[in-house]
């Protein structure tokens, strides 16, 4: 994002585990400060991860971008070299953004002390999650 790349990240409002949710949220501030646009999907739970590049290549799957997913967990991703499919995934993301709330710098900095405490505690556990 700092180099001008359009980075948009969507996290679910309903977590599969509270520690995972709060650990994830603890990194949002850094991403927003770097220029990424971060959203909370208000319409349920998202598990699949999708990355699209320039409308031509996509990567979709369940793997998180962490050491546990790469070396310990059994996760799978598909790399798709199809402009048509990639553009459909981008359209789906755009549609999901209409069901999401953007996390602004201002909103992130106004979090309560309780929320900040949950985030910091969960962030300590993030290598294990």
What are these regions (language model features)?
Residues 1-129:
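PLD/PLD-like phosphodiesterase catalytic module centered on the HKD motif
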